[in-house]
């Protein structure tokens, strides 16, 4: 009888353990889905901004510039566009990261971010990577040089540490960082 009671307690404990793990797995799946949706949306808006706004207004003499707020004939650079949109969100973080960014503030913040970014740059078939990193769930999506002006700006910027970009290259990544506890 004791053996059966012990076995029953063991089975019950295992079931409780699995029940406790299911919400965690579901939460991770929800975070992954949310990260992918956010990244795909930001990628689409950024691409539309570059292809349909930046390239169009150039014809009228308006250009993207770092100091665009001081110039009536300038608009934000595509990276500034993403960062400005991300600055208006309080529940999670959207930004850009790169292995050779013009600004050091755009370097990856953790080793896991660096590794994900390296995978994006070496495996062109991978477009989005999601992962758990400590108390955060993160996703990165390749940020491509979609037009020649992206390449020219990065290759000619005085603070650029990398000057060999070509159209279509992975220049870095769009990143989303979400707290796993929902706060």
Predicted regions and their residues:
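Bacterial N-terminal signal peptides
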Residues: 9-19
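The canonical Cys-X-X-Cys-His
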Residues: 146-158
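Extracytoplasmic c-type cytochrome modules immediately beyond a signal peptide or single-pass transmembrane anchor
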Residues: 23-145, 159-183
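Bacterial N-terminal signal peptides that target proteins for export
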Residues: 1-11
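Acidic/proline-rich low-complexity IDRs
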Residues: 2, 15-17, 116-119
């Amino acid at each position: 009888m004791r053996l059966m009671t012990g076995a029953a307690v063991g089975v019950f404990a295992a079931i409780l353990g699995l029940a406790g793990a299911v919400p965690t797995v579901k939460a991770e799946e929800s975070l992954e889905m949310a990260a992918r949706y956010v990244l795909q949306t930001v990628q689409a808006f950024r691409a539309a901004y570059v292809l349909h706004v930046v390239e169009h207004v150039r014809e009228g003499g308006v250009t993207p510039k770092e100091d665009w707020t001081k110039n009536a004939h300038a608009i934000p650079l595509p990276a500034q566009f993403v960062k400005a949109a991300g600055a208006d969100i309080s529940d999670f973080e959207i930004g850009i990261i790169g292995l050779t960014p013009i600004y050091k503030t755009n370097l990856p913040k953790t080793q896991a971010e660096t590794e994900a970014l390296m995978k994006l740059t070496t495996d062109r078939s991978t477009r989005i990577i999601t992962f758990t990193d400590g108390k955060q769930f993160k996703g990165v999506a390749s940020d491509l040089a979609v037009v020649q002006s992206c390449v020219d700006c990065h290759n000619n910027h005085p603070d650029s540490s990398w000057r060999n970009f070509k159209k279509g290259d992975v220049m870095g990544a769009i990143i989303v960082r979400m707290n796993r506890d929902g706060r």
